[in-house]
A protein has these predicted regions:
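Active-site-adjacent mobile loop/cap segments within catalytic or ligand-binding domains
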Residues: 151, 157, 162-165, 171-183, ...
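Short, flexible loop segments at boundaries between secondary-structure elements
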Residues: 189-205
Length: 258
């Protein structure tokens, strides 16, 4: 029953940032909130930020941010099954609560979007994932979960020119989905990779299909990117926050105004 919040500012064409689709990937939220803190301060003080006068830049851009798509999953990952209320017993029965990526019902939100979902579901079953689990169970139907429905509804009700899904980890940027390659998406991805030092990549196996980025690209034929922040093992430690942020802040700003 936790709320999924969104904040927005600016005027003009809309860009979407969405974080923490997975329980252990809460550092994505902190990186983007750190970015917003510095960005909004630069706007309020009419300062330059990464060489850009941000006050002027947001006269024709609106940034919409969903800091935590999966608040229940994040709480379970950090605080255990007891934080899940009525779902506590079922989560304990599933196990691995400290390695929890799914939502409170054991559905992986980034396997629950309607893009290549049937093929992904067949692959899940082939890999023995056929019931609620800590990760990679895509549910019984696309958009079966309140989190995926909320994100899909948000996108259907807003004309976003591009979208970004922040995950961890691997220092990679995913930009296409199958045969769907929106105009300028590759060029934009190459610019983001150059600014961040991350690698443009294509997912494989159980990482293909069902994801928010996949769905956005297929549904709207507009650029969308998965940004895999940092390197290591999830959950990334909070001590990584400043290093990741400093490396990404220019890329984050350019991703909005480009």
């Amino acid at each position: 029953g936790r709320e999924i919040r969104m904040l927005s500012f600016g005027t003009g064409k809309k860009v979407l940032f969405a974080c923490a689709f997975h329980g252990m990937e809460w550092l994505t939220t902190l990186v983007i909130l750190r970015f917003l803190d510095e960005l909004l301060e630069s706007i309020s003080k009419k300062n330059f930020f990464c060489g850009i006068r941000t006050e002027n830049a947001f006269h024709n851009r609106t940034l919409c941010v969903v800091p935590c798509v999966n608040p229940d999953g994040v709480e379970i990952s950090i605080n255990g099954a007891e934080s899940a209320g009525e779902y506590c017993d079922s989560i304990k029965a599933i196990g691995s609560e400290k390695r929890w990526q799914a939502n409170a019902t054991g559905v992986d939100i980034n396997h629950n979007f309607n893009a290549g979902w049937k093929a992904l579901k067949a692959l899940e079953i082939k890999n023995g994932i056929n019931a609620p689990a800590p990760t990679r169970f895509g549910g019984k139907l696309p958009e079966s979960e309140p989190e995926s429905r909320a994100m899909a509804r948000l996108c259907r009700n807003n004309d976003f020119i591009r979208a970004f899904a922040f995950h961890s980890q691997g220092e990679e940027i995913y930009w296409s989905f199958g045969e769907y390659m929106p105009e300028n998406a590759r060029l934009q991805g190459e610019l983001l990779a150059e600014l961040s030092g991350y690698t443009m990549s294509e997912p494989d196996g159980l990482a293909v299909g069902g994801g928010f980025k996949d769905w956005f690209v297929e549904t709207f034929n507009s650029p969308a990117f998965t940004i895999e922040i940092g390197n290591g093992k999830n959950p990334l430690p909070i001590s990584d926050l400043e290093g990741i942020y400093e490396r990404l802040k220019q890329m984050l700003l350019i991703s909005i105004v480009m």
